[in-house]
Structures are given as structure tokens and as C-alpha cells.
Amino acid sequence: MSSTSQKRKKIQKKFKNRGYNLKFDALDEILVFADQFPDDDDGEAIDLLLDNLQETHKSSTVDAESVRGLINRLLGAHNAPEEPTTSASSLAIIDAFLVPKFGYDSVKKKFNEHTSSLPIHGEASAKTALYRERFMLLSQRVSRAEHFSRPAFDAEMSQFENNEISSIQSLISQRGRKWVMGVISQLEDGHFYLEDLSASVEIDLSKAKITTGFFTENTIILAEGEMQVNGIFQVITCGFPPLEDRDKTLKAHSEYDFFGGGTLTKEEMIKLADLERQAVNDTFVILSDIWLDDEEVMRKLETVLDGFESVETVPSLFVFMGNFCSRPCNLSFGSYSSLREQFGKLGRMIGNHPRLKENSRFLFIPGPEDAGPSTVLPRCALPKYLTEELRNIIPNAIFSSNPCRVKFYNQEIVFFRQDLLYRMRRSCLVTPSSEETNDPFKHLVYTITHQSHLCPLPLMVQPIIWNYDHALRLYPTPHTIVLGDKSEQEVCKFGGTTCFNPGSFSTDSTFVAYRPSTQEVELSAL
């Protein structure tokens, strides 16, 4: 009998003795969890899992979703330092490849979790599903908006009360002004098209009044207009689907763990919210573009570490976002052994600050030009070959994906390192509106929050792993979004969400000190 079969039987027996019936997919999740503790011959990890399950799980049937949430919390505790400033239960770090995937069923009007494994190299149908699921996600959100054209659109922009959305296919048989919703594209220069699940239609944006945001290919828009005799839909006003209040989204979908980290009871959420308010001393220090091969940058970084080593309460978390090299780590890059040594040097630098080493956690997120299998999103964590020496010196170091999610008590924070602002501006199909703001960063924040997606660029501009597009969703809208970008540092608060760019540490010596308890952002520089 194989060792895997023996493990399966052993796990099933333990759960049966405690009165639990394990579903097949839950057993697979537990096997993966157990494999992370190869020296655990006595099954203590499984016993710990069962002890925690008895405290939170009321049903005798155990499914994959319940197990996954519990395992994420336990692994967060396992990876935490012994005496951190922030307890393991307060801070969970969720890799993009572990984010639960949900698809919307428009017939049953509910979300279904995808529990089977997701291949990195998906079939062609996965690409089609990517667009369909993005559209369905926003469509069900809009369906809850009593007046979806407000406040996303100015009240004076439309004189009509009927805001019902028509399918594009039905435009052929209808007259008068209609609202449609679809994915915008440009199949040929100067010719724009709008497509929903029923059909596509050419649209004329020459007379359209648009709202704030970057209108790029792949973005989903709401448009009011009228069908012309030439078969072109003349757009009068258009904008993004209106943003939904986070609390309203949670009320509609309280049973789903969209963010990752496990679902919580109402009592647990109240308790965590209270603890979060009390955690006034917790600080996250966020730096982007830390070029380890640049001596001047390393001297500046040591100055930052020296400063925080001497404060009364050291930061609970340091977030180091790439790029970690001044040159792109592409096929022509031949200095990987040198880069490995530089990560080791960074580990020794952190180790020279004993209070930070013992009490802070260090999260590393790769940048768009860092070493990795490809530039496709989401990006996996930095290769272990590069970080091995640093890991040995700093046990509190965590290497995660890009994007990466962090849960601080109840607060949901998304980190994304991508030079998104420049690429979104360059990919615009129409000139952004200047009526509400001329600030490009505000246009960017408006776009990604209304699209509920971190990177709504065309796939030809920024490839995405089709089966993991859900890892870039911003649904429900998180409390905080950190957009690591080489552009100037900036902060923007919009729709209940705090969004900021820490700037480029290597170029401008800028970074951010973030206090999650109050969502206060301190833009800093040397």
C-alpha cells in the first residue's frame, strides 16, 4: 500500500473517531496540509486541525471550503514569529494561488465555489470563461443598484427614468434611448464595439459624455444611447458600472469567502473589529523598488531600518515590493548567483537590527521585472534559490505572490506591484474626462474599483493566467489597496477604500508608513 493511501486511511480514521464525515475534496486539502509537516509521524498537525475544527464547525460533514479556511488560519499561525508585535491570529497573508475561486450562476442567482484543481495552462474555454465571469460579476452587482446610473453618472446627464439594461441583441427590435452593458473593444482603428453575453454592436463614442476613469479594451461599461439606421449604437453617456458599498456586498454574500483566510461568524467579526480598533500601535512599512545590486539604495534602506529599530514600538510588518534588481531579470540576465548573494546581504542587514528581526515580519512581493517563470499575472513568489540564505537568517520572512492579500483582523488589504498607471494611460481608447479630476492616479483608482479588478488591461498588453483571473478581483472592494508603481507616490480615498502608491524607493527614496487600525497613510521620504 502506498504511503499516500496509508495517510488517507489514517486521516479518515481520525476524523471518523471524532464524528466527522470527510468529503473527498476536503481530504485532498488535508493531505496537502499534512505534507507540509514531513516529520510529524504522530499526526499532531491533524490533531491540531481537528481541535480547531471542533471549536468552529457545527456540522458533522466537513467540506473543502471549511477545511481550507481553517488551514489558512493555522498556517498563518505556524509561519508567525514566536513573540511578534502582531499576533498570528491578527495577520494572515494569502498567496494569489490560494485565493478561493467563485463563479456566478445567473439562473440560481448564487455563487458556486470551484473546488477542483486549477491548471496553470488552461484550455481555450478558460479564456472565454474569464471574460464571461468578469461580466457576470459586475452584472449581478449592478442588478442590486436601484438607480444604477447614480452616483456613477451625473443626474443631469440623463433625462430618462427607465434605467433597465437591455441586451445588445434586443436593440435590433427596440427604438428610443436604451441602456446597455458590455465589454468595450476596438477591432479596427477608430471602430469601437460593445459585447455582452447575447451579441456585439458597433458603437459611436464621438458625441459621448464619459465619466472618470481609463476606458481601455476589456473594460466593462454602461452606455446610454440609441440605435441608428446604419446599425451603429450612438452613445450619449457612458461610464463604468456603479460602485457598490462594501457592507451592501457583504450583506448579499455573507456566506462566501471571496478574499481567502476563511469565513467568520458574526460574533468573531465583532470581536476582531474591536481588537483592530485597539491595535493603534501597529504599523506597516511599505517600500517598492529595492534594488539590491545598488549600493546607494542599500545604504538608504539601512538608514530606514536604523530609524525603525530605535522607535518605541517597532513596525509589525515590513512589505518589500520589487523590483529587487536594477536590471530586468530576463533571458539575458546572467547574474543570478550574485543576486542570491545580495538577498543574503539583505538578510544580514535585517539581522543586525535585533528588535526588528525578533518582533517584525517581512513580506516580499516580486515586481514585474523580477526573476520568475514569466511576466504573466499572477506572479508566483521569488525563487527559493535566490532567497534561501535570507530565509535561514530571518525566519520571519514570508515570500508571496504578486498580487498578494493581507488580512489584518477584519481589514482586507491587497498589494499589487505593477507599473499600472503608465500602461493604463497608454492603452486608453478615448481621452479621459477632466470634468471631475485631472489626476491620473484618481482615474486609475476609479477604474480598478469600479471594474472590481486590479488589471483590466487587454490580455495582449498584460497576459493573465486564465484560470487564476479571480486572484486579481477586487470583490467585495477591499479596505485598502496598495499599488506599487514607479510613478510619484500618492494616496487617494474613494468609496470607502484607501488606495496609495508608496513610490519608488530606489528612484525617489520614498516609502509609506501605514497604520491599519485607523487606515492612516503617512507618505515618507529620506
UniProtKB/Swiss-Prot annotation:
**Positions in coiled-coil regions:** none
- Gene3D superfamilies, sorted: 1.10.8.60
Alphabetized, the UniProt keywords read: Cell cycle, DNA replication, DNA-binding, Nucleus
Per the entry, induction is: Cell cycle regulated. Up-regulated at the G1/S phase transition and then decreases rapidly as cells progress into S-phase.
Gene symbol here is DPB2
Q: Report the source organism.
A: Arabidopsis thaliana (Mouse-ear cress)
Major localization listed first in the record, in broad terms: nucleus
Query: What is the protein name given in its UniProt record?
Result: DNA polymerase epsilon subunit B
Q: Which domain of life is it from?
A: Eukaryota
Q: Kindly list the biological process annotations in GO that this record carries.
A: DNA-templated DNA replication; embryo development ending in seed dormancy; positive regulation of cell division
Subcellular localization is given as: Nucleus
